Amino acid sequence: MVKLAFGSVGDSFSATSIKAYVAEFIATLLFVFAGVGSAIAYGQLTNGGALDPAGLVAIAIAHALALFVGVSVAANISGGHLNPAVTFGLAVGGHITILTGVFYWVAQLLGATVACLLLGFVTHGKAIPTHAVAGISELEGVVFEVVITFALVYTVYATAADPKKGSLGTIAPIAIGFIVGANILAAGPFSGGSMNPARSFGPAVAAGDFAGNWVYWVGPLVGGGLAGLVYGDVFIGGSYQQVADQDYA
């Protein structure tokens, strides 16, 4: 059962919430800067060569490490979502209100966009790589993104949002980073392995290329929502209950 709660203006504009939005902006900026930056660096080192297995591994590791750090530095303030699909999945499971979630989205999208604009500036206008399906149809790309984002948000629930997580919560950031790195290795050559609408939106804005960008909204949001339904309803149950900031917003 969906446990969506709209929330109140007062709660969404409280000092604690404002700090959470700023934390999401900064953490998403740092994550996307490192993630997209690793792809740009690969192109620089290979003179624009095609992605090879070693490059895929390097980019996957860069994303995993950057997300581990991003989640860690924001966890005690905002919960460390860094991803509209994670925020949506947690909203479906009743762990963040819709109104607050919308502002999380704004912060995440702005952070990703600023990161890519900064990369364009500091690399003297190097092309910002955007996500695009390769060798498969866009519909197949959506399914790919649904599956890998489900895995990501399910991991978030199991290690961070579940009130029964106990000491497992201490490894949440690294577990989340690991699943993202693994999913990039699996999906990178096909859908790009986004799992994150903000991670795809920022480069699209900086490059002015939104071709196929809808894939990276539909797939991750469906996958994140399904994970919220499954874990939130089957394994947690109950009604709406805001999770404390220090646990996972």
Swiss-Prot record:
Key words of the record: Membrane, Repeat, Transmembrane, Transmembrane helix, Transport, Vacuole
A GO term for molecular function: water channel activity
Motif NPA 1, residue numbers: 83-85
Any one GO BP annotation for this protein: water transport
Family recorded in the similarity comment: Belongs to the MIP/aquaporin (TC 1.A.8) family. TIP (TC 1.A.8.10) subfamily.
Function: Aquaporins facilitate the transport of water and small neutral solutes across cell membranes.
Name used for this protein in its record: Aquaporin TIP2-1
Organism in which the protein naturally occurs: Zea mays (Maize)
